[in-house]
Swiss-Prot record:
The keyword Hydrolase does not apply. Catalyzes the dehydration of D-xylonic acid to form 2-dehydro-3-deoxy-D-pentonate. Keywords: Lyase. Optimum pH is 8.0. The gene is yjhG. Belongs to the IlvD/Edd family. This is D-xylonate dehydratase YjhG. NCBIfam families: yjhG_yagF. GO terms for cellular component: cytosol. It comes from Escherichia coli (strain K12). Activity is increased in the presence of Mn(+) and Mg(2+). Inhibited by thiol compounds. One of its GO terms (biological process) is aldonic acid catabolic process.
Length: 655
């Protein structure tokens, strides 16, 4: 195409052009003291605010910063002018506007800035997944820089929904120790009537390839799953869990997580959150007073009670780090998961696969917290963004009209009793719900690993609560090669899949949801286990062991496994103990002792083809090095400036 063609459709209107304008009427509310003592940036900021059309006489009011992961471009009719990367951030402008209107009505000055986010669902199985986890640190850093760019802000309100943008936003808010901050969860997308949820629909390719879904059904299911244009996915994945954790931290107002996006209650949550931020600012209650060690432990407790995503093992420590709190250790997670029962029955864990909006209607986080309070598992004296303690919030919730009316709506509209979604501890135990997370160790994972043990298919667990699988390994150096074999009928019941080289150094610690989701929804999948140094989507279920340490590219034993090796997996889902061990090879006439097997594995070289993915971006390579120096996955893949600085100084001194 020539330059002439590019400009071929010019309108003659372009030649009607102004080169001057009158400028805003009125005067800035300046005083002699302001002109003498305030920096020029403050004064010029007022000039620009007037230029954008704000009433000049209102410009010396307290600034409240709205920070969002908004994406896409909505027309006046709500239809897309430009598509977003996911529906989770597509409607956030509605919540932003609702909050801004409250701020203005209360004689403060709202500002809005944006750092949009990617979609883990969109990037599954693509090189885009190499940027997924690293994005979180980068986005949080940009958000913190934006917040500091309005240095006189009296409060910051974060509005976010999904897998990486929401943790990044919470990290950014957690770092604002000396001002008020509030998180507005972006809610959940509505489930489709007679449609599949957003987790199951991501398996249409694998099910079609295995003859378990017709082409026509795949087309229909793929079109229908997202029944509304906003909110995070309908399951308790990383997005939904992060919303729940925000409430558990006291960083979001009560009963705000998992609200149905676009509905009146969802808008009101934004308005109420703005009122909360203004109240905190007026009372002088800062983030440092809300995000404490006790608040972090409450969030971990709520995570366990909901059966949350294993990705929060990466995000909660990162939030704690930014808040200046104790970073939870594996021992902390084990301690909490051993004492906290899972109480919530939603996708993907079950036993009944309710969409997360049903958990909101059943009372959401405060309802779960009432049960946890009855067990003495919460720190009720913590301060929250309401300006009241958690105890005061729960006392209000227990007797609120809101609680009763939403439960009744769930019964009237869906014929579902709220107690079937959020169970009492006694009912949960009777239904066979187990605690959420187990950390297996063994000669394959000497530094540990993670499994969402509560999500293993119950039919695969014996009467003592034990999942046991001894089988032959099939080793893959990429998720792509594993999913190829799944789609081409090369995986059979009883296999143990091992995907190596997909930890932080290999692929940015990508999610392997293509594999885990296929195993969940294929008829033979419950008889297949997975071991990997990658991580999992929050919607993953089954006998899937991830976060294996050390990772293969750091010389970990997992990188020394070969196809044909015999592996034993044992998970005690009640006592939360687990082992994952190399036993020998399929050709061994007599298996070696455990000690001998460990020595054999350790003596092997790593797989000869083990390398970082050739398409791994330099940005992600840098992230992998920085987070490794800072403590790695068990400290949340954070950037610890002191540790990074010490490592650089040590390197320079040696060279």
């Amino acid at each position: 195409m020539s330059v002439r063609n590019i400009f071929a459709d010019e309108s003659h209107d372009i030649y009607t052009v102004r080169t001057h304008a009158d400028g805003p009427d009125g005067e800035l509310p300046l005083t002699a003291e302001m002109l003498i003592n305030r920096p020029s940036g403050d004064l010029f900021g007022m000039t620009m605010n007037a230029g954008m059309g704000w009433s000049p006489d209102e410009l010396d009011r307290d600034g409240i910063l709205l920070l969002s992961t908004l994406g896409g471009l909505r027309g006046a009719d709500g239809k897309p002018v430009a598509l977003a990367l996911h529906q989770g951030h597509y409607e956030l402008d509605i919540q932003m506007k609702a909050a801004a209107e409250v701020i203005k009505a209360n004689h403060a000055l709202p500002y809005a800035v944006y750092v949009s986010d990617p979609c883990d669902g969109r990037t599954q199985g693509t090189t885009g997944m190499f940027d997924s986890l690293p994005y979180r640190n980068d986005a949080s850093m940009v958000m913190r820089r934006l917040i500091r760019s309005l240095p006189d802000a009296k409060a910051v309100i974060g509005v976010a929904s999904c897998d990486k943008g929401l943790p990044a936003t919470m990290m950014a808010l957690a770092a604002q120790h000396n001002i008020a901050t509030v998180l507005v969860p972006g809610g959940a997308t509505l489930p489709a009537k007679d449609g599949e949820d957003n987790g199951k629909v991501q398996t249409i390719g694998a099910r079609f390839a295995n003859g378990e879904l017709s082409l026509q059904d795949a087309r229909r299911a793929g079109c229908k799953a997202c029944a509304s244009s906003g909110g995070g996915c309908q399951f308790l994945g990383t997005a939904g869990t992060s919303q729940v954790v925000a409430e558990g931290l006291g960083l979001a107002i009560p009963h705000s997580a998992l609200a149905p996006s676009g509905e009146p209650v969802w808008r009101e949550i934004a308005r109420a959150s703005a009122r909360a931020a203004l109240n905190l600012s007026q009372k002088g209650i800062t983030t440092r007073e809300i995000l404490t060690d006790k608040a972090i432990e409450n969030a971990m407790t709520v995570h366990a009670a909901f059966g949350g995503s294993t990705n929060l093992l990466l995000h909660i420590p990162a939030i704690a780090h930014q808040a200046g709190c104790h970073i939870p250790t594996v021992d902390d997670w084990i301690r909490i998961n051993k004492r906290v029962p899972r109480l919530v029955s939603v996708l993907p864990n079950g036993p009944v696969y309710h969409p997360t909006v049903n958990a909101f209607m059943a009372g959401g986080v405060p309802e779960v917290m009432l049960h946890l309070r009855s067990l003495g598992l919460l720190h009720e004296d913590v301060m929250t963004v309401t300006g009241s303690t958690l105890k005061e919030n729960l006392d209000w919730w227990e007797h609120s009209e809101r609680r009763q009316r939403f439960k009744q709506l769930l019964l009237d509209q869906e014929q579902i009793n709220a107690d079937e979604v959020i169970m009492s501890p006694q009912q949960a135990k009777a239904r066979g719900l187990t605690s959420t997370i187990t950390f297996p160790v063994g000669n394959i994972a000497p530094e540990g690993s993670v499994i969402k043990s509560t999500a293993i298919d119950p039919s695969m667990i014996d009467e003592q609560g034990i999942y046991y699988h001894k089988g032959v390994a099939k080793v893959y150096l990429s998720e792509k090669s594993a999913i190829y074999d799944i789609k081409h009928d090369k995986i059979k019941a009883g296999d143990i899949l091992v995907i190596i080289g997909v930890g932080p150094s290999g692929t940015g610690m990508e999610e392997t949801y293509q594999v885990t989701s296929a195993l969940k929804h294929l008829s033979y999948g419950k008889h297949v286990s997975l071991i990997t140094d990658a991580r999992f989507s929050g919607v993953s279920t089954g006998a899937c062991i991830g976060h294996v340490g050390p990772e293969a590219l750091a010389g970990g034993p997992i990188g020394k496994l070969r196809t044909g090796d015999l592996i034993e997996i044992k998970i005690d889902c009640r006592e939360l103990h687990g082992e994952v061990n190399f036993l020998g090879t399929r050709s061994d006439e007599q298996l070696p002792s455990q000690e001998e097997a460990t020595a054999i594995l350790n003596a092997r070289p790593s797989h000869q083809d083990l390398l970082p993915d050739p398409e791994l971006p330099d940005d992600t390579r840098l992230w992998a090095m920085l987070q490794a120096v800072s403590g790695g996955t068990w400290t949340g893949c954070i950037y610890d400036v002191n540790k990074i600085g010490a490592a650089l100084r040590d390197f320079m001194n040696k060279n």
